[in-house]
Amino acid sequence: MTSVPIFESVSRFLPPANEDEKFWWKVTGRHMARMMHEAGYPEDRQVECLLFHRFKVVPCLGPRPHSDTPWYKSRVGGGAADGCPINYSWRFGTADRRPHIRNFIEPLGALTNTSADPLNEVATKALLHDYSMTLPNVDLEAFWTFAPHYRPRIIEKADMEKLAGASLLVGAEMSPDSHTIDIKAYMYPRVPSQTSQLLTTILPQAMRDAYGEDVCLDSLNFVHDFMTKDPQGCQLVLTGTTGIDCCKLQDTRVKIYVITRNTSFDHIAAIVTLGGRRPISEELLGQLKALWYELKGAPAELPSSEQLPVQTKPDGSKNPIVVPFYFDIQPRLALPDVKAYIDVSTSPVSDLAAANAVVCHLEQHGSGQNPRAYLNVLKDITPVEELETQKGALAFYSVAVKKNELDITSYFNPQVYKRYFAHEVQLNGQRRSVFE
């Protein structure tokens, strides 16, 4: 575990903290410091973001772990995660842009995991309100308008118990060349019928409430038509997840998340190009195909029209493969932007091999500034031998086309519960029994 001088300097002058906050700061604060150091953030920006993390994120992470089993299994990080309420992303730089660091959290509070707050909304809404009071660029007008449309209507107590779980997450982006913290909120409708009504009822009404009755819904209507009429788009399934920028209404984007179970590259390309309506050069499609095959462990000779080989779990059961995407909806645009997610947590490729493949791709195509700094981060958070032999550190890589190049982001997990005993050794110098 390499020393990070700015983290040590900031820590030296922090006021006393309780044991929970002390733990989360030592683990996740150090992770954030390492990421910003490797990404080349200016020192004043590193200090600013570390202080934000310490006082506006750490207190929301709940009780420190006391075993390798979470007391509340957070939705952050998806299937690859271990229930920890925080994970990170590293958006690789381009020729003219340094990497961008983000974290995603599910705030935990006194009412989390109780019948008083079955959807775990209270702590998240309190945190967002606090951000709107302390961060000048944060505007919650769109969020407060959209959120009621995603809440389940009054239902039977027994049904509510079945639907209990995360309904809101928060993302914080800390750009290196800014003095703002950009906040995003993610909403999860818990009732299945709400998901099926998302494009036809919930989002149109929410957008009219937010922007006015005359708001242009061309981009949203395109997504609906694409998913109901296009032979490739018809294979997409709504997850219900919706992301929204917490900024001025005119700049707010709405992200709609979908999945497909068709893993042929031809299908992936059809979704990314919106059935040819958003043309992408053959060169970039070739790059995306090569990356897709390598991260999924597919043989190079596999025809692009064929499905990926089904993976078998150690217990002999099949490991289903799904491919997530999101559509980026903005009232002023006729067509949505599209981003694809490559799930590496279910891939036969090791986490380290996947990370090396992405870095080699960036180096080969002259993209990014020092992409190997990302490898330094991964190896600092998770030992190399674990990256080589175990899964769980990496969740997804997302890929979009921006300015005629692939814009790639890595999403990864601190594995605070999975690596509980290792953290105990690092923080306390000895392994302690979970029964102490």
From Swiss-Prot:
GO terms for biological process: alkaloid metabolic process. Its EC number is 2.5.1.-. It holds the Pfam family Trp_DMAT. It comes from the Eukaryota. InterPro entries: Aro_prenylTrfase, Aro_prenylTrfase_DMATS. The keyword Zinc does not apply. GO terms for molecular function: prenyltransferase activity. Prenyltransferase; part of the gene cluster that mediates the biosynthesis of neosartoricin B, a prenylated anthracenone that probably exhibits T-cell antiproliferative activity, suggestive of a physiological role as an immunosuppressive agent. The non-reducing polyketide synthase nscA probably synthesizes and cyclizes the decaketide backbone. The hydrolase nscB then mediates the product release through hydrolysis followed by spontaneous decarboxylation. The prenyltransferase nscD catalyzes the addition of the dimethylallyl group to the aromatic C5. It comes from Arthroderma benhamiae (strain ATCC MYA-4681 / CBS 112371). It is an enzyme of class 2 (transferase). This is Prenyltransferase nscD. The keyword Cytoplasm does not apply. Keywords: Transferase. Belongs to the tryptophan dimethylallyltransferase family. Pathway: Secondary metabolite biosynthesis. PANTHER family: INDOLE PRENYLTRANSFERASE TDIB-RELATED, PRENYLTRANSFERASE ASQH1-RELATED.
